[in-house]
């Protein structure tokens, strides 16, 4: 008997994130699913501040996904970044996805899903934010104080005389044997300050919470008029018979002669299947299915699965985890005409979700970007 397909969860844009960082016992920012804003940092992990591999600019933060796995003791966070320079949008080196993990106790985790996850001793997409409406975190306009707190530098910004005197006193008490430790501490502090500068120089999109729904539960409750309108517009512009083509995609692809009569451009068959799948919920901005199958918007390269690189840390295979959907494009906005365009962005992560002991920086995972074959379909 074939194994059941992994469940699929959808991410939808919710309320705008406003106000200061949460506190007073409320959930920490890193336990938040959000689009835009700045990436949050897990305890004991420095925030990632990636730069574009093409132009060198600081990458903008697109999406944060809090995604602990059921059989793992780790908090787990994935952040997707992209270059906001239009010349870089379609370049693979202009996109980054960083995975962070922390062994902090999850018994009282911020999303309130600890008890449920303890009952599920398997890695499942169901573990992604079972109580996703319990939000926390900083918005895209977070203060410099909040940024310093994330980087652990809030104590280093004061220039008061009393603190200077205290520093002098501490230095006078140092022994020569402590010199190496001091040097290492200073180097770490300088590195953190450099990362802070990089983080604050990156463009920032307006931030919104992401709410989560189960694809199986969501089906049948939405009006599909919007999706049907998009498909009809495409049919009129390209002169193709969409109903005939999509019926073939589900009935089988053994009728090449009929397919050719539609005079469809190369890649359209994949595009129509993509549109058919998302038509029930065209406003979805994120699709999550750990270990499942991605939806390609155009035909991927031949033998694509074999080209997905193994985990650079442990050498294990990578599996599909989530993808960014076309509707996200129109929801990414900021000052000075800030924008990023794409068709879909597919993220593959280590199947073991490895995390080295004492790791203090995020691990980079594999990201595959497909450009939109016709961006105006999703405006």
Curated annotation (Swiss-Prot):
A GO biological process held by the record: apoptotic process
Pfam families (alphabetical): PDCD2_C (PF04194)
InterPro entries: PDCD2-like_regulator, PDCD2_C
A single Gene Ontology CC term: cytoplasm
Protein name as it appears in the record: Programmed cell death protein 2-like
């Amino acid at each position: 008997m074939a194994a059941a397909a992994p469940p699929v969860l959808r991410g939808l844009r919710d309320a705008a994130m406003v106000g200061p960082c949460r506190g007073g016992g409320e959930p920490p920012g890193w336990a938040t699913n959000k689009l835009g804003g700045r990436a949050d940092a897990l305890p004991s992990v420095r925030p990632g501040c990636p730069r574009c591999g093409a132009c060198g600019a600081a990458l903008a933060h697109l999406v944060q996904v809090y995604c602990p796995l059921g059989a793992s003791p780790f908090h787990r966070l994935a952040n997707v970044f992209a270059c906001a320079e239009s010349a870089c949008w379609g370049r693979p080196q202009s996109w980054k996805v960083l995975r962070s993990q922390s062994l902090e106790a999850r018994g009282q985790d911020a999303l309130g899903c600890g008890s449920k996850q303890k009952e599920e001793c398997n890695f499942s997409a169901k573990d992604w934010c079972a109580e996703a409406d319990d939000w926390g975190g900083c918005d895209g306009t977070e203060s410099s104080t909040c940024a310093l707190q994330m980087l652990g530098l809030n104590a280093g910004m004061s220039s008061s005389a009393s603190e200077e005197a205290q520093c002098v006193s501490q230095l006078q008490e140092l022994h020569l044997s402590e010199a190496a430790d001091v040097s290492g501490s200073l180097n770490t502090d300088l590195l953190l300050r450099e990362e802070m500068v990089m983080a604050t120089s990156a463009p920032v999109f307006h931030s919104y919470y992401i709410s989560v729904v189960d694809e199986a539960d969501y089906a049948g409750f939405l009006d599909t008029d919007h999706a049907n309108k998009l498909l009809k517009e495409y049919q009129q512009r390209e002169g193709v018979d969409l109903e005939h083509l999509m019926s073939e995609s589900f009935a089988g692809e053994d009728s090449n002669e009929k397919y050719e009569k539609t005079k469809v451009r190369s890649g359209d068959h994949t595009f129509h299947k993509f549109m058919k799948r998302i038509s029930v919920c065209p406003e979805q901005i994120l699709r999550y299915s750990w270990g499942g199958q991605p939806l390609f918007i155009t035909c991927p390269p031949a033998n694509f699965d074999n080209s997905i690189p193994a985990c650079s840390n442990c050498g294990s295979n990578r599996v599909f985890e989530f993808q960014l959907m076309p509707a996200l494009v129109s929801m990414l906005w900021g000052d000075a005409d800030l924008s990023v365009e794409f068709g879909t962005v597919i993220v593959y992560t280590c199947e073991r979700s490895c995390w080295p002991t004492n790791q203090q920086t995020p691990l980079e995972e594999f990201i595959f970007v497909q450009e939109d074959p016709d961006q105006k379909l999703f405006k």
